[in-house]
Structures are given as C-alpha cells and as structure tokens.
Amino acid sequence: MANKFAIITGASTGIGFELATLAAKDGYDILVAADEALIESAAQDFRQFGTSVDSLEADLSTFEGVDGLLAAAKGRQIDLLCANAGRGLGEAFLDQDIAEWRKVIDTNVVGTSYLLQKVLRDMVARNDGKVLVTGSIAGYIPGAFQAVYNGTKSYVDSFVAAIQNEIKESDGVTLTNLMPGPVETEFFDRAHMLDTSVGADPKKSDPADVAKDGWDALMAGKAAIVSGWKNKIQSAVANITPNAVLAEQHRKMAEPGTAE
C-alpha cells in the first residue's frame, strides 16, 4: 500500500499497454482495464516490474462499467489515471450500423467524461493527482469516412481544455491531453480500416513512442502534447485550413479501397 496507485484503461494493447508498462516501471501499483479478455495476459507482462497489478475486463462505454472499474480500486486513492480507452470506426457514416457508431460515442465521450468526473472530483478535493487523456489530432479534422470517431475526438480535445481551465486553481492536479496521429496498433483492424490508405501505411507512429511522449508531458505538468513532428505540423495547419479541404484530405486517407 506504500506505492502510488494508477489506473490505466484500454491497457490490453497499443498505447494503453505501453502506458501501463511505464507506470509499473515507475513503481506504481496499477489497475488495468480493457473490454477484452486479453487484459489478463497483459497484466502478466506488467507484473515483471515488481509492483502490484490487478486487471479487469470491463465495458467502459457504460456507467456500470466505469463504476465497476472504480470499485475494483478497493478504496485506494487514485494518484494517476490514464484515460486511454477508445473505439474507432471507419467506412461511410450512412453505411455504419447504429449500434457500432453509438458504441464509439458511448466509449469515447460518455465513458471518458464520466470517469474523469468521478476521479477528478477526489483529486481536486485534495489538490493532488495526475490524469492523462488520450485525445487525437483527429479532433482538428473533419473525418470523412471516419466521421463519428473524429467527432468524438473533437469533443475530447475541447472537453479536456475546458476542464483544465475550470480546475486551474488546483495547482496540485495535472490534466494532460495526449494527441497522437495514426499509431501502429489494432485500432485500424477493429475500426474496419485495413483497406484504407492510412490503415495500410507502414509509417504510423510506434505506440511506445507515443506513450512515452504522453508520460513525459504528464510528469512535466504540460496541458497537451501532440506526439510526432509530422502530427505537430498537421495540427497546426489544420487550424488555418478550411473544413472542406480538410475533409477531402481525410477522405483520401480513410476511404475504403484506397490502400496501396
């Protein structure tokens, strides 16, 4: 119980897996969660670093799933939260199944907002704690053939910036937005995007590099970090580019059948 305690969501693979690895290496006891059974084997990997590791398979798109995650903390003070759980979805919006696009919104928007509200209340009350949220530079770009996902990340990016302002008097609490671009993870397979230009691109970011960027920014108390120099340029250009142009550019990356 002497170690600090961290919760990392979406930790079975990708960025979340790498964030959990960094937390365990840094001496945090961790509770890791994901919506798949693979989280159990991921937890085994994290135990090699000698801290306490608990895992939970949970649907964090629901209030019940988030409540179950917090209950699994067993009353321990949450010193660090990596709110990384997210869901993608490609293809044309009109062709998407309603249940699938609603799951994206419920996971990325509803679940993330609820988890942050529950955790940040306690952190702000004691004026101590760290939260890293996985947003995306996709939030700056109208996502043709990825419309719902990009819309949810626009919400996350804006939401985090707003909450940072609301809690600015709590100088002991750090809230950081990690904004990567395309990352080499299972995301594109799960989002039905392997036949797209961006899904097939072999030059996507390494999740370990993205996680390290986010971790370093969090520990330095930064408000936000865009991971990767190409993504920094893209996010900056997006602020001065008309939406119609951005949407057409995104279409070329995300339209099904564009993979080379």
Please provide the spans of the model-predicted regions.
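Active-site helix of classical SDR
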Residues: L116, T152
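Conserved glycine-rich Rossmann-like NAD(P)H-binding loop of the short-chain dehydrogenase/reductase
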Residues: D26-A42
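Residue(s) in the substrate-gating loop at a strand-loop-helix junction
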Residues: S136
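Substrate-binding pocket helix/loop in short-chain dehydrogenase/reductase
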Residues: A92-F93, D97-I105
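Conserved glycine-rich cofactor-binding loop
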Residues: S12-T13
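The beta1-alpha1 cofactor-binding region of Rossmann-like NAD(H)/NADP(H)-dependent oxidoreductases
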Residues: E57-G68, I98
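SDR active-site lid
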Residues: N165-W229, I240, A244-A247
